């Protein structure tokens, strides 16, 4: 036996929303592989903490453990710092996508990995969903795992993308209630924006839609992030998702910031650059999409009421915390030069509430053709 910290929270589905402690928290998530550029899959506690601090800094609030249970320290840190976790069983059968899950001789192997995940990590309140695995089709073996989890732990939700897409590379099934025994959320992988908006309009499914994977971050990508989040913020039933994925999995054993992958060690066969699809470099330096995501989901949203009078309306997007810990710095620029600036040190808006502020803004002298911008920094 060993001691561990515990916590209390409630998770339930009501009216197309996943409620955490009664609030429909948007999932601002990312998929994360365990990876260190020097030690590979052996990740230190310090490296894990670096990831969590960076995620919090860029407004991520959730992680899917893709595609296996993580080091025990990871869950302890998520409990402490406030990251929601989808814990995933170490089940993935790409080439045999719809086969192993339907063969009785594999049932115990499926159940063993599922039980081990739940029994090992059940005391961590940061875990809000158990995932039955990744891209493994759907069959009786998944149903057995789902049944065991529902009997063992009714305090959390079930998540499994494969229950909505039983055929490899097939279309996901948006039918109301399709395979709802195996997943409490509609969790498609790489749906188009039109797909998810049409689902809102046409499906009678009472579950929320939380994308299992979207906005694949390989190469020059993530180009539709703002369009996805416009859809999420404006359609009841869409509750966020998990970007694929967190870190480029390059290796730098010599410490010279030349990351190797996909044949650089003379390894054949290899997957070329298919492990280089992260939002951050192997050394955790952010790619440009990180800055865009941070802006899209920032905890304060501003609307102009009367710019000449300096009147703005702020909306606190947080679900459990007021704005007293945040101050506002603003500046007015004309053609890139700051002409006015100021600070509002006290913001008072309860969770999911609005407030009005007035900037000490004087009407500037603007010549024809000049560009004027008001910048807000929280």
Feature locations, PLM:
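Extended acidic/polar, glycine-enriched regions
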Residues: 1-14, 365-378
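Extended substrate-binding grooves/exosites of carbohydrate-active enzymes
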Residues: 2-311, 318-324, 329-338
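Buried hydrophobic-core signal for structured, non-transmembrane domains
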Residues: 311-318, 374-378
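Intrinsically disordered, low-complexity Pro/Gly/Ser/Thr-rich segments with frequent PxxP/GP/PP motifs
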Residues: 327-375
């Amino acid at each position: 036996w060993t001691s561990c910290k515990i916590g209390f929270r409630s998770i339930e589905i009501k009216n197309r929303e996943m409620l955490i402690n009664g609030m429909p928290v948007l999932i601002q998530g990312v998929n994360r592989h365990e990876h260190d550029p020097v030690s590979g899959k052996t990740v230190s506690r310090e490296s894990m903490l670096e990831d969590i601090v960076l995620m919090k800094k860029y407004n991520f609030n959730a992680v899917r453990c893709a595609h296996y249970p993580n080091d025990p320290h990871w869950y302890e840190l998520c409990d402490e710092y406030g990251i929601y976790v989808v814990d995933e069983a170490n089940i993935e059968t790409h080439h045999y996508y719809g086969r192993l899950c339907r063969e009785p001789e594999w049932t115990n192997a499926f159940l063993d990995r599922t039980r081990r995940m739940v029994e090992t990590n059940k005391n961590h309140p940061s875990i809000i969903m158990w995932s039955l695995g990744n891209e493994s089709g759907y069959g009786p073996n998944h149903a057995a795992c789902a049944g065991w989890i529902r009997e063992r732990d009714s305090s959390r939700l079930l998540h499994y993308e494969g229950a909505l897409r039983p055929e490899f590379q097939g279309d996901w099934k948006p039918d109301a209630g399709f395979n709802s025994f195996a997943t409490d959320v509609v969790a498609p992988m790489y749906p188009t924006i039109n797909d998810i908006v049409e689902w809102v309009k046409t499906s009678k499914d009472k579950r929320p839609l939380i994308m299992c994977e979207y906005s694949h971050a390989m190469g020059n990508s993530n180009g539709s992030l703002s369009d996805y989040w416009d859809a999420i913020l404006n359609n009841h039933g869409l509750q966020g998702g998990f970007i694929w994925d967190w870190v480029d999995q390059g290796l730098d054993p010599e410490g010279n910031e030349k990351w190797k992958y996909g044949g650089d060690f003379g390894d054949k066969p290899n997957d070329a650059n298919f492990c280089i699809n992260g939002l951050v470099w192997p050394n955790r330096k952010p790619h440009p999409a990180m800055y865009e995501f941070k802006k899209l989901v920032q905890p304060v949203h501003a609307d102009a009421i009367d710019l000449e009078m300096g009147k703005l309306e702020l909306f606190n997007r947080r679900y459990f915390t007021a704005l007293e810990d945040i101050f506002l710095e603003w500046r007015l620029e004309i053609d890139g030069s700051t002409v006015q600036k100021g600070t509002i040190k006290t913001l008072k808006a309860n969770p999911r509430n609005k407030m009005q502020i007035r900037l000490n803004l004087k009407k500037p002298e603007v010549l024809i053709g000049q560009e004027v911008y008001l910048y807000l920094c929280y």
